[in-house]
């Protein structure tokens, strides 16, 4: 039988892998043909560097999360996993912030810079980007919980002995 | 006499406070009158939510960094400082990523979305935003070094005892 703590941690890691994978798939499949000033164009995530960064970062975190699932419990490498969790949480924060900032311009535009909002023309594309960002946020929250849990279980026995 | 380690940590914290303060001042004072399609306008950081977030985040981290400077060494609260360092490093990463993503659109535009680059019209403004981002990056690197240093000095005695 698995310990409840280990089971909870495994469940959280499964959710995290699912969420980052969903973020990659939803963002990568987002495209829609729109018309802008009578010019037809196709909105794709590759048009926006911030969205490309989001896909790459989430793909990296998915691969990492998947590999950690098969990591045996009680291995001395868990200290490394704690450090890597931290690094990949920072990568997620960075990619979500960047994608969110550009998505905000896409939704509301920036009148001072003369950037018009595009979500009116490509509603489906915008909804998909929003979905990907929500999936990314779920992954981020899961990783932060995992991080707090790891720090607690890792530090607690050390603190008791100290 | 201060210990060399403590002196180094204090020096790093001074650099971090200076860098975040510089980021706030440079970004907050950035404004330039430009002409866009014969319409005169003034580019300011308040036009862009991501830049406002950058200024607020850096201001918060400046205040925190300043307060920590006066924190007595050997206090039991240093464990809290380590946790807060982590939180504020994440805040810095997030704000810099968001500002960088929008600054990239400002510099290169996004032809698919019909967003024209604005740096040709407001070069001085763009240079100041770039300066603020560089200051923010310096602060971020300093905080990451501080974090690694804190984790090392905090965990080392515990690991030896364990």
From Swiss-Prot, chains A, B:
Its main location: membrane. Keywords: Cell membrane, Membrane, Transmembrane, Transmembrane helix. It is a multi-pass membrane protein. InterPro entries: CASP/CASPL (IPR006459), CASP_dom (IPR006702), CASPL (IPR044173). The chain crosses the membrane at residues 7-27, 50-70, 80-100, 131-151. Pfam families: CASP_dom. GO terms for cellular component: plasma membrane. It is found in: Cell membrane. Residues 28-49, 101-130 are extracellular. Residues 1-6, 71-79, 152-162 are cytoplasmic. Disulfide bonds: none annotated. It comes from the Eukaryota. Homodimer and heterodimers. Belongs to the Casparian strip membrane proteins (CASP) family. This is CASP-like protein 1C2. It comes from Populus trichocarpa (Western balsam poplar).
């Amino acid at each position: 039988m698995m310990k409840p703590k280990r089971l909870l941690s495994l469940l959280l890691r499964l959710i995290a892998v699912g969420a980052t994978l969903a973020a990659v798939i939803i963002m990568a499949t987002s495209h829609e043909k729109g018309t802008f000033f009578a010019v037809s164009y196709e909105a794709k995530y590759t048009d926006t560097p911030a969205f490309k960064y989001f896909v790459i970062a989430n793909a990296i975190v998915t691969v990492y999360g998947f590999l950690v699932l098969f990591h045996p419990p009680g291995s001395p490498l868990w200290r490394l996993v704690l450090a890597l969790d931290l690094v990949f949480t920072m990568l997620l924060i960075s990619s979500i912030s960047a994608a969110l900032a550009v998505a905000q311009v896409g939704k509301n535009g920036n009148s001072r810079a003369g950037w018009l909002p595009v979500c009116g023309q490509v509603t489906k594309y915008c909804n998909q980007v929003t979905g990907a960002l929500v999936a990314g946020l779920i992954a981020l929250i899961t990783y932060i919980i995992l991080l707090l849990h790891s720090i607690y279980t890792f530090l607690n026995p050390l603190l008791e002995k100290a």
